[in-house]
Amino acid sequence: MICRRPRGIVKVLTFLAITAALPASGQAPIETLHVPELDAGFHLLYELKPGEARKQFEIWHESNPEDPLGSASVAASYLFEECIQQGVLTSKFFLDNKLFLGKIPLHPDPTLRAAFFAADKQAQDLAQQRLRTHPGDANALFAMTLSLGMEADYASLIDKHQLDSLKMVREADKYAQRLLVAAPDAADAYLGLGVANYIIGSLPGIKKFFLGFAGIHGDKRVGLQQLAIAAAGGHYLRPFAKILLALAALREKKPELARTQLKELVAEFPENTLFASELAKLNVPAAK
């Protein structure tokens, strides 16, 4: 989306309202988006067990070689692992403008990087094959939205290539809009869009001016709302959205919102030391 007016957050909330009314309208959620084997893999991922998570994803992909969700899930595991290794998902990173918004790229693991882009490309290739014959296929649209959104996140968070990130988010948004027609409950679609909107909206004025001159806009408010949508109604990416929302909330001086997200994450994933550590940091001032 990268904050296009007037089609922005109003349209997103309209789709969520449609989702809430699904039983009355007779439309059912797209169940194929919710695969138990992938659920198990993502749970392992959020317990900081990326290797075990990938085994789950790869087993499912071997049984469903033409479905792009398997490859997209594998790519997500590499991105999450890279973010953990680089310290991206910490308050130290988010609250330091030099780290969060600076031009200096991080130093990703070459093996993880190559594996991420390979899995991400495979997901897009498989998705495009499906869309050529089934343009409304929910899994394919979700895989395209997710894979492009992850590329955008990698570009902005790891490589610090904001313009490249924006180009990919614009493309991801096209698939997100189509996805929400096919599957109005697919709130995961807003994770990548929310991250990019928030980061671009947080840039210093001069940088935003030049991007705006080129017709590219970011909006922190819209980004936070999109992250909140994914955190509340997402499926596979809900915990990812919750930690990002918590960290963004800390930047915006909204500690209670951050605390709520972190408490819920710690309760759901007790083996995740990162979530527990961030909650402990937040609780130190409150305990004094």
Regions found by a protein language model. Name each.
Residues S73:
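N-terminal carbohydrate-binding/catalytic regions of secreted carbohydrate-active enzymes
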Residues A28-E37, L44-Q56, E66, S77-G136, ...:
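Short coil/linker segments at helix-helix boundaries
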Residues F240, L247-K288:
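A cross-kingdom marker for long, charged
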Residues M1-G8:
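N-terminal secretory signal peptides that target proteins for export/translocation
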Residues G26-I30, A286-K288:
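Compositionally biased, proline/threonine/alanine/serine-rich low-complexity intrinsically disordered stretches
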Residues K11-P23:
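Bacterial N-terminal signal peptides
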